[in-house]
C-alpha cells in the first residue's frame, strides 16, 4: 500500500468569513491523495506562536480571499514554509508577485492549465575541494633560473650608437619628406624652456591691446545720482573732541546728550498719552439699533444663549432692535 502524502492548510484571517473556501481546499487535497494533518492561521506562524516541522509536509495550500495580483504575504514565511516541505513538495496559493522570493528559497515555478504551484527542489550542497598550497618544483638547467612566478623583463640602457642606428632606421621607413620626431621634441623643449612672462605677453597681444589708464573705471560712475541724493547715516559732531559719532559720549559735556534725551522724552510722552473717547464717539456704536455698527457677536437682542461673556445685557430677556433698555437696576446689583 502506498504511503499517503501529508498536507497543511494555511488560512488568511479574511478567509474565516467564508468557511467554504477552506473546505474546498481540503477536499481538493484529498482528491489528489493528500491527507491534511493540520490547518493554521497565517498570522500564528508569522508571530512565532506556531512552529512548523522541517521536511514534514508534501503539500501546503494557502487559502486567501485576495485576488492573485493583490496578494499580500510575508516574504520571510516563504523560507519557513520551504523548510517544512519535503523535496519535490508543492506550495499552492501564491502568485508571480513573489516569484523572486520563490527562486531565492530554491523553489521552481510550475505552470499548467489547471494548477499553478511552486515545487521545492533539492538543495545543492557545496563540496569541499582540496587546494595544494605548495608550488610544484620545476627542474632547472645550468644557466637558467626558473621560479613559480614569471621572470621580469630585463631592460638595457641605450648607448649613443644604438640611438644613431634607430634614427637611421626611422628615416629609411618614413622617408625624407617627414620631419623627425626628435626635431619636434627639441622644438617643444625650446618653447617650454622660455620665460613664462613671454607667454603671457603673447597671450595679451593676441587678445587685444593692453589696458591703459583711460580704460580704468571710476568708482563714482558706478553710483547713480538718485543714490547719492539719499540721506546717509546721521552722524553727530562732538563739540568737545570735534569728532563725528553716532551717539553722544558717555561723559558728554557739549550738550549732545541732553538733546538726545529731549528727543527720547518727546517720544515717550506721545506713547504715554491715554486714548479717550468723547460722548459722540461712544454712542457711535449702538448694539440695539438694527443696521448700525455692532460688536463682535451682533446678537445682543436675541437673549443670553447668543450673548458674549462680557455683554452688558446678560441676565435680561430678549428685546427688539431699537427698544430702550434701562440698565439702572444692574447698578443696584453691583
Curated annotation (Swiss-Prot):
Region N-terminal SAM-like domain, annotated ranges: 1-131
Region Fe-S binding site B, residue ranges: 297-311
UniProt feature, compositional bias: Low complexity: 140-150
Residue span of region Disordered: 135-229
UniProt motif (Cx2C motif 2) ranges: 308-311
One term of GO molecular function: electron transfer activity
Taxonomy, superkingdom: Eukaryota
UniProt biased composition (Acidic residues): 182-192, 215-227
Residues the record lists as binding [4Fe-4S] cluster: 297, 300, 308, 311
UniProt keyword annotations, A-Z: 2Fe-2S, 4Fe-4S, Cytoplasm, Iron, Iron-sulfur, Metal-binding, Mitochondrion
List of residues binding [2Fe-2S] cluster: 238, 249, 252, 254
Any single biological process term in GO: iron-sulfur cluster assembly
GO cellular component: mitochondrial intermembrane space
Stated family: Belongs to the anamorsin family.
The record's note on its domains: The C-terminal domain binds 2 Fe-S clusters but is otherwise mostly in an intrinsically disordered conformation. The N-terminal domain has structural similarity with S-adenosyl-L-methionine-dependent methyltransferases, but does not bind S-adenosyl-L-methionine. It is required for correct assembly of the 2 Fe-S clusters.
Subunit structure: Monomer. Interacts with TAH18. Interacts with MIA40.
Function: Component of the cytosolic iron-sulfur (Fe-S) protein assembly (CIA) machinery required for the maturation of extramitochondrial Fe-S proteins. Part of an electron transfer chain functioning in an early step of cytosolic Fe-S biogenesis, facilitating the de novo assembly of a [4Fe-4S] cluster on the scaffold complex CFD1-NBP35. Electrons are transferred to DRE2 from NADPH via the FAD- and FMN-containing protein TAH18.
UniProt-recorded name of the protein: Fe-S cluster assembly protein DRE2
Origin species: Zygosaccharomyces rouxii (strain ATCC 2623 / CBS 732 / NBRC 1130 / NCYC 568 / NRRL Y-229)
Gene field: DRE2
Amino acid at each position: 500500500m502506498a504511503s499517503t502524502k501529508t498536507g497543511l492548510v494555511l488560512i488568511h484571517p479574511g478567509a474565516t468569513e467564508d468557511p467554504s473556501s477552506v473546505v474546498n481546499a481540503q477536499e481538493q487535497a484529498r482528491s489528489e491523495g493528500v491527507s491534511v494533518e493540520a490547518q493554521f492561521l497565517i498570522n500564528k506562524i508569522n508571530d512565532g506562536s506556531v512552529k512548523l516541522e522541517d521536511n514534514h509536509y508534501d503539500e501546503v495550500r494557502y487559502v486567501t480571499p485576495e485576488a492573485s495580483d493583490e496578494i499580500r504575504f510575508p516574504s520571510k514565511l516563504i523560507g519557513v514554509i520551504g523548510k517544512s516541505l519535503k523535496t519535490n513538495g508543492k506550495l499552492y496559493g501564491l502568485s508571480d508577485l513573489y516569484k523572486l522570493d520563490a527562486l531565492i528559497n530554491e523553489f521552481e515555478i510550475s505552470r499548467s492549465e489547471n494548477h499553478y504551484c511552486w515545487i521545492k527542489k533539492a538543495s545543492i550542497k557545496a563540496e569541499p575541494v582540496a587546494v595544494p598550497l605548495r608550488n610544484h618544483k620545476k627542474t632547472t638547467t645550468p644557466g637558467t633560473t626558473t621560479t613559480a612566478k614569471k621572470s621580469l623583463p630585463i631592460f638595457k640602457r641605450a648607448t649613443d650608437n644604438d640611438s644613431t642606428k634607430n634614427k637611421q632606421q626611422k628615416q629609411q621607413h618614413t622617408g625624407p619628406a617627414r620631419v623627425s620626431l626628435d626635431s619636434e621634441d627639441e622644438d617643444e623643449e625650446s618653447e617650454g624652456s622660455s620665460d613664462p612672462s613671454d607667454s603671457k605677453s603673447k597671450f595679451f597681444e593676441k587678445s587685444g591691446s593692453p589696458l591703459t589708464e583711460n580704460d580704468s573705471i571710476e568708482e563714482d560712475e558706478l553710483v547713480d545720482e538718485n543714490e547719492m541724493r539719499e540721506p546717509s547715516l546721521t552722524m553727530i559732531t562732538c563739540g568737545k573732541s570735534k569728532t563725528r559719532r553716532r551717539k553722544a559720549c558717555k561723559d558728554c559735556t557739549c550738550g549732545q546728550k541732553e538733546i538726545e534725551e529731549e528727543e527720547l522724552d518727546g517720544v515717550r510722552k506721545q506713547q504715554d498719552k491715554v486714548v479717550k473717547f468723547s460722548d459722540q464717539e461712544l454712542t457711535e456704536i449702538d448694539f440695539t439699533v438694527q443696521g448700525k455698527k455692532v460688536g463682535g457677536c451682533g446678537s445682543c437682542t436675541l437673549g443670553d444663549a447668543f450673548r458674549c461673556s462680557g455683554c452688558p445685557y446678560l441676565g435680561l430677556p430678549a428685546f427688539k432692535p431699537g427698544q430702550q433698555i434701562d440698565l439702572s437696576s444692574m447698578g443696584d446689583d453691583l
